[in-house]
């Protein structure tokens, strides 16, 4: 599984840099600076945790607000000491964290969604998109790990009347991402690329997973999966 900060560094000098969410190693001083500047921040384990340990943070007036999975505050603090005591309790099981800006992603009604593309090598070693899906969050959740519905990406694009060229763009980016990571990290056979669309229409890569959970992809045919070459998976 890819380290999120390492993955970010794979792309910072590539054409895909504009799609990568800015990422920093966890630093309490940096976090407070961003919150004091009126930014909302997301802190999360550097390696995937299925949404566990992810905290959204912001500062309103003199108070700090912490959110776990939903848009409703889990806790409110009046001092940084209280805030960091709370954060440290969450981080105890996974001390290596990162900081990212919190991005307001587009919703379908009250459901945030992300779009996942499975990229695999065929028998000739050529990267191809073999499946896609869209995870719809429960209402008022800001994470999609506990999705209430999984639908094809094309369906959500139609529901929101989004330009269908976005589909082609995400496929092209996914294949290019696989090629870049292989160049940086060595041969492997498959990965997933997760995308989100910001409310202003900007496309972002949320995450790249080198050990995809293929059970989510109900639309992958037996013919496609049986043709995948036996490459190493990171």
What are these regions (language model features)?
Residues 16-25, 42, 61-110:
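Conserved ATP-binding module of the ATP-grasp superfamily
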Residues 60, 118-122, 196-200:
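Short beta-strand micro-motifs enriched in acidic
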Residues 1-40, 45-59, 64-65:
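Conserved N-proximal alpha/beta basic substrate-recognition cap immediately N-terminal to
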Residues 51, 135-141, 209-218:
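Glycine-rich phosphate/pyrophosphate-binding beta-alpha loops
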Residues 88-106, 122, 127-131, 136-196, ...:
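A long amphipathic alpha-helix within ATP-dependent nucleotide-binding catalytic cores
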Residues 195-211:
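A short beta-strand motif that forms the metal-chelation/ATP-contact edge
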Residues 55, 67, 111-135, 205-208:
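Beta-strand scaffold of nucleotide-dependent catalytic cores
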Residues 214-234:
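Charge-rich, low-complexity intrinsically disordered segments
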């Amino acid at each position: 599984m890819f380290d999120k900060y390492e993955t970010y560094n794979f792309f910072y000098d590539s054409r895909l840099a504009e799609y990568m969410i800015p990422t920093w190693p966890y630093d309490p001083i940096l976090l407070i600076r961003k919150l004091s500047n009126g930014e909302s921040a997301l802190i999360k384990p550097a390696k995937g945790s299925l949404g566990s340990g992810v905290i959204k943070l912001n500062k309103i007036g003199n108070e700090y607000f912490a959110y776990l999975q939903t848009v409703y505050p889990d806790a409110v603090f009046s001092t940084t000491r209280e805030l960091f005591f709370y954060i440290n309790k969450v981080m105890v099981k996974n001390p290596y964290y990162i900081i990212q800006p919190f991005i307001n992603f587009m919703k379908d009604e009250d459901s945030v969604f992300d779009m996942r593309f499975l990229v695999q090598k065929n028998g000739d070693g050529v990267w191809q998109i073999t499946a896609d899906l869209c995870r719809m969050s429960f209402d008022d959740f800001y994470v999609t790990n506990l999705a209430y519905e999984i639908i094809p990406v094309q369906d959500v694009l139609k529901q929101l009347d989004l330009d269908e060229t976005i589909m082609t763009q995400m496929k092209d980016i996914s294949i290019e991402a696989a090629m870049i990571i292989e160049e940086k990290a060595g041969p492997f056979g498959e990965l997933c690329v997760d995308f989100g669309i910001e409310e202003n229409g900007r496309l972002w890569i949320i995450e790249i997973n080198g050990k995809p959970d293929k059970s989510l992809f109900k639309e992958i045919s037996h013919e496609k999966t049986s043709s995948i070459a036996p490459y190493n998976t990171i």
